[in-house]
Amino acid sequence: MSKLQLSIAVGNYDRMRPLIDGDVQIDGVDPVFMLQDPEEIFFRAFRTADYDICELSLSSYSVKTAAGTSPYIAVPVFPSRAFRHSSVYVRADRGINSPADLKGKRIGVPEYQLTANVWVRMFLEEEYGVKASDIQWVRGGYEDPTRIEKISLKLPEGVSLVNAPEGRTISNLLADGEIDGVIGPRAPSCFDRGHPQVKYLFEDPQKAAAEWYERRKLFPIMHTLGVRKTLAEQHPWLPGALVKAFEHSKAVALTRLSDTSATKVTLPFIEDQLRNARRLMGQDFWSYGFAENAHVVDRFLARDHAEGLSSRRLQPAELFHPASLESFKI
């Protein structure tokens, strides 16, 4: 029997390289990998379902699943996870010295429903009492003024969201002082260029994130992996094969990362970072699997619905193909 030739769109991450390079195989699949930025993958996945298998924004996927309009069903593989205390940038000349100072401010976002922004709004409210309705939100492309919100939104009463002026980007508005800050998964270019009046909200984002993790035990999930529903129906073995292969690929990547005799990453002190991550979060700090991550997914789904993004309160198991909820053990 010939293997299924399937398109797989993912980011070019170390945890994907063993699969991409052919060191790890997906049982029964001849993969055609398409290495793309998340913004392109998500736009094409949710607009035209271009791929057989692809990385999915957790927020956009949850919104689509709640509405019953997702062409994909996920498996508990999480290509992207990130603490987002480093995702809040503010003007240094606006008296913003703590999260509470964001109340009443104009804050730019590339898209309101981005997964990173949901996590940020969660900890701003739970830890610092800053509600979404306390902020005036301005939506626009970071660097391209034509960027649009991928998914139509119906926000709760009291939440103010306006579009950036025509032809203006969020980075330009921040640099020119027309907004007070930015929340998003990428640094605005004015920050990267060293604008003297643009800074992190948290003076030490890594310390703030570690303290938050110690309190909440949440390593935020950004992206999951989706397979076209029709494919999963035709080939019920496929979801399990994907979990097995992507888990193996990640394990190979972590083994390589742990070999610090000649580091595989072009970054000094990586061995200390790895040791600190394991000390804080355990050996399997970047876990896949449903049981290991159900509490993280549940917290996200509760917030996504509370913000008016998902039309109903989903349960974690609803996001994932039933055959992928458990894996074999030896």
Swiss-Prot record:
Q: Report keywords, A-Z.
A: Aromatic hydrocarbons catabolism, Decarboxylase, Lyase
Specify one Pfam family: Phosphonate-bd
The reply on keyword Ribonucleoprotein is no
Organism lineage reads as: Bacteria, Pseudomonadati, Pseudomonadota, Betaproteobacteria, Burkholderiales
**Gene that produces this protein:** phtD
Give each disulfide bond as a residue pair. Answer: none
State the Gene Ontology terms under molecular function: 4,5-dihydroxyphthalate decarboxylase activity
Enzyme Commission number: 4.1.1.55
The family annotation for this protein states: To P.putida DHP decarboxylase.
Q: Could you identify this protein by its name?
A: 4,5-dihydroxyphthalate decarboxylase
Q: Which reaction does it catalyse?
A: 4,5-dihydroxyphthalate + H(+) = 3,4-dihydroxybenzoate + CO2
Pathway annotation: Xenobiotic degradation; phthalate degradation; 3,4-dihydroxybenzoate from phthalate: step 3/3
Species whose genome carries this gene? Comamonas testosteroni
Q: Which GO terms describe its biological process?
A: phthalate catabolic process
**Highest taxon above the source species:** Bacteria
